[in-house]
């Protein structure tokens, strides 16, 4: 079908397709031609048994390999990203990684902390790093670890950058309209307008992932990439929330001399 053809075209062009799981889809049902989630109790992979996790990994890897190998016969999935960045505790996923030949994880966002109703995570103690190895805990680097972590790093915005960003989004609403009709789950508990305003006044800086979702200020993200001391940064993007400003940001980064590399190129260049 069309979807398989798109994936095959991706690998033919030298890019990678890897495993990404959102297990709350196990609890979905269809009503009036729409998907309805009965609950989000399985949003985190670790809400499932180890046996179920292994089963999902095997099914996903086998499906992706089956599709990709029609275009590239020796293709093999080697990386994983957990839905909602929820990869901890890793002990429960380790067997699935080993059985399925997963050597790379990219679920960690150094500096991020979320306390939501659906899930919570805490990577606030991790320093920015382009890559590292780990063994039993993705938050503890181990040079002898068998699994590679390629974090999605972030940057901090000052209060004034935050204000300028908000104004830019308001003035460029057409560029901020998403192409798709999908929505991401809200992981932040609802708070009052007053509480948000007070939080804004008290904070001196705001953490943001390097990402291309929603409205993107090209000048801001290029400046933050240039200021990074890392040898490379990973930028995340969800097709369902891409906008015209997302595409313009990619063009702007390229025009400024930044190069986009595939996972294969990164692993080979840095001999990871």
What are these regions (language model features)?
Residues 225-246, 263:
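Substrate-binding cleft of secreted/luminal carbohydrate-active enzymes
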Residues 79-226:
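Active-site-adjacent pocket scaffolds in enzyme catalytic domains
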Residues 106-113, 259-272:
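A generic structural motif
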Residues 1-86, 145-149, 154-161, 232:
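Metal-dependent polysaccharide deacetylase catalytic core of the NodB/CE4 family, i.e.
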Residues 3-8, 57-65, 94, 219-223, ...:
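Generic structural signal for well-ordered alpha-helices
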Residues 1, 26-27, 89, 113-114, ...:
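Flexible loop/turn segments at secondary-structure boundaries
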Residues 12-14, 100, 229, 256:
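Structured helix-beta-strand junction loops
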Residues 16, 103, 259:
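Residue-level detector of anion-binding/catalytic polar loops
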């Amino acid at each position: 079908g069309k979807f398989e053809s798109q994936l095959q075209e991706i690998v033919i062009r030298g890019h990678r397709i890897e495993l990404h799981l959102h297990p709350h889809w196990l609890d979905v049902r269809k009503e009036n031609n729409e998907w309805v989630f009965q609950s989000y109790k399985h949003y985190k992979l670790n809400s499932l048994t180890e046996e179920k996790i292994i089963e999902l990994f095997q099914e996903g890897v086998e499906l992706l390999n089956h599709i990709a190998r029609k275009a590239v016969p020796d293709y093999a999935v080697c990386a994983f990203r957990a839905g909602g960045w929820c990869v901890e505790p890793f002990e429960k996923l380790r067997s699935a990684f080993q059985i399925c030949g997963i050597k790379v994880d990219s679920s960690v966002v150094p500096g991020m902390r979320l306390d939501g109703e659906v899930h919570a995570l805490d990577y606030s103690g991790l320093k920015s790093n382009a890559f590292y190895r780990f063994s039993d805990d993705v938050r503890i680097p181990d040079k002898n670890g068998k699994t590679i972590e390629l974090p999605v790093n972030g940057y901090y915005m000052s209060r004034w950058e935050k204000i300028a960003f908000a104004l830019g989004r308001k003035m460029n609403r057409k560029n901020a309209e998403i192409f798709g009709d999908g929505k991401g789950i809200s992981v932040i508990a609802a708070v009052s307008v007053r509480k948000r305003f007070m939080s804004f006044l008290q904070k001196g800086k705001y953490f943001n992932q390097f990402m291309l979702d929603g409205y993107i200020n090209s000048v801001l993200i290029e400046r933050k990439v240039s200021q990074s001391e890392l040898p490379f940064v990973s930028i995340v993007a969800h097709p369902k929330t891409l906008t015209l400003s997302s595409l313009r940001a990619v063009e702007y980064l390229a025009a400024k001399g930044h190069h986009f590399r595939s996972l294969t190129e990164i692993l080979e260049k840095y001999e990871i």
